[in-house]
From Swiss-Prot:
Belongs to the TRAFAC class OBG-HflX-like GTPase superfamily. OBG GTPase family. This is GTPase Obg. It comes from the Bacteria. It is an enzyme of class 3 (hydrolase). Mg(2+) binds at residues 176, 196. Monomer. GO terms for molecular function: GTP binding; GTPase activity; magnesium ion binding. GO terms for cellular component: cytoplasm. Pfam families: DUF1967, GTP1_OBG, MMR_HSR1. It is found in: Cytoplasm. GTP binds at residues 169-176, 194-198, 215-218, 285-288, 314-316. Its EC number is 3.6.5.-. Keywords: Cytoplasm, GTP-binding, Hydrolase, Magnesium, Metal-binding, Nucleotide-binding.
Length: 439
């Protein structure tokens, strides 16, 4: 993997507001009282995340973190429909997990196939023009809707590598050296722990068979709690099909190789029990050192893997490396290949469907607050400067049963009714709009 790796980011996305509907009337020479002809506003632009196989890092989001879509155009005379706002497409690497909080709950979507799209923020609906409000008894509607506000989201992005094989082991066990000799990858290599601070990918070819190997940053005890490079390490092996567990058989850092094997598997189990069951091939590395040769008999007896999955190697001299790769290729062929074919599909946040007609009423310090998707959307799309706006809200309160429910709850004359950002004075079942700043 060339360049700098960046595997998490936080962005803000804002979909476009819908355009306003028009409250206009026909003006014809011989029709002095023409009917309503106001057109609808256009939809606000959506914001999408798109899985792009050509990307491998979230680094661009270090520089740019805000994405705002275009507002829809306003409606016009002669039923002219406003133009829809342009959508925004944000490209992310395949394997990116997006998370956001909606109504206090966290939802996530996994963009694990090329071409997958996530509708991250939905553009607002265009406001209706006054042609929609004309009836036989209301032939001159002086009302049109404002555009619905577009959705706004704070989104956390996390990249989980899509590799077939993960190289795991304590820092300085030789993972980067092994990757450099089995592939064209050139990770930073040095004789001290934590040389690898970011994942590296390499493509390995065994005959006509090839697979992707990820050299993951080294693990230490407590990684499942985020100690050291813990989370950076563990999240990237979740998608691998097989692990090569590299052990410093020479114990050059003063640790016991058997304890190393047990400690890393325990960290896998504590982070995610399924990871501890992931197939492993064990490589006893640094066999070119005398200390390793002295430990081999004990290690073979103590490490609980089958003989065919235990290899003595030297990444520095390539001793035993070819046999190791043959076995890895053999194991991978036996496993079902992951389905990563392109998918032309649009996903949405997995929010449970809620009946928009539902509402709640609660007592506040000086009045009452009504909450509900449909009634709150109506308020947000109401232009209170229009003469007939309050009349429409009054009708909706009565038809929906909210007015009766408020009276049953105990609302009194003079109480204040709050819906969305608007406030109304209540008097004998009728509402009067409170101008902002007026008490």
């Amino acid at each position: 993997m060339a360049g700098e790796f960046y595997d998490s980011a936080r962005i803000f996305v804002q979909a476009g507001d819908g355009g306003d509907g028009a409250a206009t009337f026909r003006r014809e020479k011989y029709v002095p009282r023409g009917g309503p002809d106001g057109g609808d506003g256009g939809r606000g632009g959506h914001v999408y995340l798109v899985a792009d196989p050509g990307l491998n890092t979230l680094l661009p989001f270090r520089e740019r973190t805000r994405f705002i879509a275009e507002r829809g155009g306003n409606g016009g005379r002669s039923r002219k429909h406003g133009r829809n706002g342009r959508d925004v497409f944000i490209r992310v690497p395949v394997g990116t997990v997006a998370r956001t909080v909606i109504d206090g709950e966290t939802y996530s979507v996994d963009l694990d196939a090329p071409g997958l799209r996530l509708l991250a923020a939905r553009g607002g609906r265009g406001g209706l023009g006054n042609v929609h409000f004309a009836t036989s008894s209301y032939q001159v509607p002086r009302i049109a809707e404002l555009g619905e506000p577009g959705e706004r989201r704070e989104i956390e992005l996390e990249l989980k590598l899509l590799a077939d094989v993960g190289l795991i082991g304590f820092p300085n066990a030789g993972k980067s050296t092994l990757l450099s000799v089995i592939s064209a990858a050139r990770p930073k290599i040095a004789p001290y722990p934590f040389t690898t601070l970011q994942p590296n990918l390499g493509v390995v070819e065994v005959g006509e068979y090839s697979f992707v190997v990820a050299d993951i940053p080294g693990l230490i005890e407590g990684a499942h709690r985020g100690v050291g490079l813990g989370f950076s390490f563990l999240r990237h092996i979740e998608r691998t099909r097989l692990l090569i567990h590299i052990i410093d058989a020479a114990g050059v850092d003063g640790r016991d190789p058997v304890n190393d094997f047990s400690a890393i598997n325990e960290e896998l189990r504590l982070y995610q029990p399924a990871l501890a069951q992931r197939p492993q091939v064990v490589a006893l590395n640094k066999a070119d050192l005398p200390e390793a040769q002295a430990n081999l008999k004990r290690l073979r007896a103590a490490i609980p893997v089958s003989e065919q999955d235990l290899f003595v190697i030297s990444a520095a001299t390539r001793e035993g490396v070819d046999a190791l790769l043959q076995r890895v290729a053999e194991r991978l062929r036996e496993m079902p290949a992951p389905h990563r074919a392109p998918r032309d599909e649009t996903l949405t946040w997995p929010v449970p469907e809620v009946d928009e007609r539902l509402y709640t009423i609660e007592r506040t310090g000086d009045g009452w607050r009504v909450r509900g998707r449909r009634i709150e959307r109506l308020i947000s799309m109401t232009n209170f400067a229009q003469p007939d706006a309050i009349m429409r809200i009054q009708r909706v309160l009565e038809a929906s049963g909210i007015g009766a429910a408020l009276q049953e709850a105990g609302i009194q004359n003079g109480d204040v009714l709050y819906i969305e950002q608007a406030a109304f004075d209540w008097e004998d079942g009728a509402i009067t709009y409170r101008m902002p700043g007026v008490s």
